[in-house]
């Protein structure tokens, strides 16, 4: 059975997801509690104001999500601890994802899936009022804030749907236009991505046609004007198109002209809200980099300093490491000593495999780990610059792509030699900068980068299945991905990096 029928309002969809309730015998769309909760424009505005935080916490804040497992699955980070499915997703050789509802780490996909749909539900509820219900949101001075509220709801709607498409193989497309009295069929990730981009297009159009500034607490630390919201939506659209391919063939088929159009109107600033350790925080960054937890995989270390091994061999590896670099040295990336910290010991358990071992950790954002109140990025301007370069690579405009790369972090922060205007050098440099300069920023970034380059270790799931517990609720057959489960090269990797 590949369909599910909802007879409920948007909020009921989330109630089913969150409670695991198999019964659909609940209140209908005329539910007076819902009508009361969204009867006032101020209530709807308040929900819209919380959407940035709700989405950010789904991709950065949650320890119970897929960010950490994708990080180690991409061999960007490494950790032998069983927490957050990090050990299970980084086994060598790789193993299939256990998608049973009884799996101890099932909460990682369950929380991610439910959380994104919960945020989507809130967006849809706002849009149902301001677009379908013709509710007008008016500020105290009489300013019409309906376009602002609508734009934010469309932005987060697109991001929420988009990350379902980036992470999972399929899901349910539910927007403010969905007739929830009818059957909602499951859709493949490509259709989800397409819908998400259309949502972002609506946000972009609203931002171009209107002028507004969000309240300070909607995105702490950033004055989010209509221009900046529009830039964020453009970058988000480029991200979804660029990062969604599951292999090289898919990547070649991307509409790179469209990616370039979005990126050229994308971020001129870093989207990095200031944390308060109460409503805004990033457990993803914390558990990836706090002392004793995750470390940088030796693949990353070797990329910056080729004298180091790309894989930890055995106990004797400590005795064969080269002297560490602490000043600029030709052929070695300066960021190995500005953004990473050498460690003389490794806390991981030997019996779980030396392949987990590393001698470096990521230290660039250590100020957050000591104060918990600094800005933490999800999307950065340099990420948008790389999207511009990638679009030019595929036009091809090799000189233009090389110019962007040589004016950017590779040279200015890494101290590396400029790249030549060749397709191979440019492609390698984009891949490199996403792994090094954007290390541990946006959740899943390194995984998506490795995935579309066919470089994830053989057997690594290329996407995750709808959680088993949700399949049970939907009366759908359980399935999963990994070695022998799914289609090689489409559902699990048949490539690799070593």
What is each residue range found by the language model?
Residues 1-19:
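Sec-dependent bacterial lipoprotein signal peptides
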Residues 38-45, 84-383, 394-400, 425, ...:
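Structured, solvent-exposed acidic/aromatic patches
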Residues 61-65, 434-451:
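Bilobed periplasmic-binding protein-like "clamshell/Venus-flytrap" ligand-binding domains
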Residues 389:
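Active-site-proximal region of nucleotide-activated glycan assembly enzymes
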Residues 419-420, 428:
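C-terminal soluble interaction/assembly domains
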